[in-house]
Amino acid sequence: MKESLISFIKEKIEEYNYRGAVVGVSGGVDSAVVLSLCVQALGKDRVFALILPERDSSKDSLKDAVDFCERLGVEYRKRSITPILRKIGVYRLFPPRLFLPDSIVKRYVLNRWNTLSKDPFLDDLRNTGPEEFLKGLAYYRIKHRIRMCLLYFEAEKRGYAVVGTTNRTEYLTGLYVKWGDEAVDIEPIMHLYKTQVFELAKEMNVPEKILKKPPSPDLIPGITDEMAFNMSYLELDRILMKLEKNEDLSDEDPKKVERVKKILELSEKYRRDIPITFDRI
């Protein structure tokens, strides 16, 4: 699989006359895998990594992103998007977090998460909820859209492609932002479920610290992917695979199966063809 993906990236970069690749690096497993694949496909001199933290970003993830770029020896730039978001007025939607410990901020956010909606992830997909909840959607989505603009700015200055990091689980469930992290030129891992990305990451010697970190969009403090799904990635991927293959689901939790079906139903309208993806195997 790894060699196929390396060949895919190399072939598509050449086919579409790109000179190299730009990857947004978050400190998570998906961007670590994609950055590694790009380096192996193109060489480190043709890969540029962009790290774009903001006020709510995890300091640990920021350090992991920097450490991983330095480990691979790629050119990278760290740029805070906090000033841009502040200028737009994004942070006025929620109280300032100056001088507050992360633990208090996370408890506050978690309380709002559970208070504003009975099921925040489904309401996110529906684009419904009270005004405060909708403000929350605007609050986190714009962060990805600002990052997309900066990724393309850096890519086009160099004649590079923006290489995305969305996996199949995220794509099928709608765990991405339209015109944000899904707006890219090439998607090399969109055919891989999250659990398969973890397996590939182990094969590619991604640091254990990144592998053990709870997957999170790192847009809202304290909110993880599995918290949004209300199940583990292992359970989610297993159910998704069975649904795609029309396999027997009798040994799965019926409530979780129904939840996944509802997520797929609601997320369908968000899915659209990405220009260049690796064919599913």
Curated annotation (Swiss-Prot):
**Molecular-function GO terms, alphabetical:** ATP binding; glutaminase activity; metal ion binding; NAD+ synthase (glutamine-hydrolyzing) activity; NAD+ synthase activity
Q: Which residues of the sequence carry a binding annotation for Mg(2+)?
A: D30, E170
Q: Which InterPro entries match?
A: NAD/GMP_synthase, NAD_synthase, NH(3)-dep_NAD(+)_synth, Rossmann-like_a/b/a_fold
Organism source for this protein? Thermotoga maritima (strain ATCC 43589 / DSM 3109 / JCM 10099 / NBRC 100826 / MSB8)
Q: Which Gene3D superfamilies match?
A: HUPs
Top EC class, one word: ligase
Pfam families with a match to the protein in the record: NAD_synthase
Which terms does the UniProt entry file under GO BP?
A: NAD biosynthetic process
Keywords attached to this Swiss-Prot or TrEMBL record, sorted alphabetically, are: ATP-binding, Ligase, Magnesium, Metal-binding, NAD, Nucleotide-binding
- Which residues does deamido-NAD(+) bind? R145, K178, D185
Cysteine pairs forming cystine bridges in this chain are none
Entries under PANTHER family matching the protein: GLUTAMINE-DEPENDENT NAD(+) SYNTHETASE, NH 3 /GLUTAMINE-DEPENDENT NAD + SYNTHETASE
Could you give the subunit structure recorded for this chain?
Answer: Homodimer.
GO CC entries: cytoplasm
Q: What is its EC number?
A: 6.3.1.5
Q: Describe the function of this protein.
A: Catalyzes the ATP-dependent amidation of deamido-NAD to form NAD. Uses ammonia as a nitrogen source.
UniProt family annotation = Belongs to the NAD synthetase family.
Instruction: Kindly state which reaction or reactions the protein catalyses.
Output: deamido-NAD(+) + NH4(+) + ATP = AMP + diphosphate + NAD(+) + H(+)
User: What is the official name of this protein in its record?
Assistant: NH(3)-dependent NAD(+) synthetase
Mind giving the lineage of the organism this protein is from?
Answer: Bacteria, Thermotogati, Thermotogota, Thermotogae, Thermotogales
- The keyword Metal-binding is assigned to this record: yes
Pathway it acts in?
Cofactor biosynthesis; NAD(+) biosynthesis; NAD(+) from deamido-NAD(+) (ammonia route): step 1/1
